[in-house]
């Protein structure tokens, strides 16, 4: 299984469910609800989608880049984030550099701040919701083009979350 095939399978099983909710919208409010999961899956579609942890581990193992334990270690170490839904843990694919088969350093940097106060579900939502500090743009869309702004937004949101 290659990552390209995997990304396609995620997209194929994710029918379009409309626009991403605006900040404060309640589609993401219930982390365990089916509707919230569907909204989150749709929100990540343009950035590679989301995938189950076991699928990512199998892909990494096939490429000689790790296994389920190494994936779990990266999550526990705060290098990646995941969220749970329906007794499965899911990872947004934007966290990976698919050409180098590594975790994107920009993700590690943001997680070093937000991972202190946000759980996996909150992190997943934070990256795809329009952010006021970013003039209504989504952090996930700005990681490559305005990374310093994303870091500042993460630090501001961390401050607000922990005051």
Residue ranges and their predicted role:
Residues 1-163:
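Non-transmembrane "mature" sequence context
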């Amino acid at each position: 299984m290659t990552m390209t095939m995997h990304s396609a399978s995620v997209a194929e099983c994710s029918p379009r469910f409309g626009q991403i909710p605006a900040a404060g919208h309640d589609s993401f409010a219930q982390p365990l609800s089916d509707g919230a999961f569907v909204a989150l899956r749709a929100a990540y579609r343009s950035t590679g989608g989301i995938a189950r942890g076991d699928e990512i581990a199998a892909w990494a193992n096939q490429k000689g880049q790790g296994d389920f334990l190494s994936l779990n270690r990266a999550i526990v170490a705060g290098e990646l984030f995941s969220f749970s839904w329906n007794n499965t843990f899911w990872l947004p694919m934007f966290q990976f550099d698919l050409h180098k088969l590594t975790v994107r350093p920009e993700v590690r940097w943001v997680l070093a701040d937000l991972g202190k106060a946000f759980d996996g579900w909150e992190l997943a939502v934070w990256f795809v919701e329009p952010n006021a500090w970013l003039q209504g743009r989504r952090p996930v869309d700005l990681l490559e083009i305005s990374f310093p702004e994303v870091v500042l937004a993460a630090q501001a949101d961390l401050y607000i979350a922990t005051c």
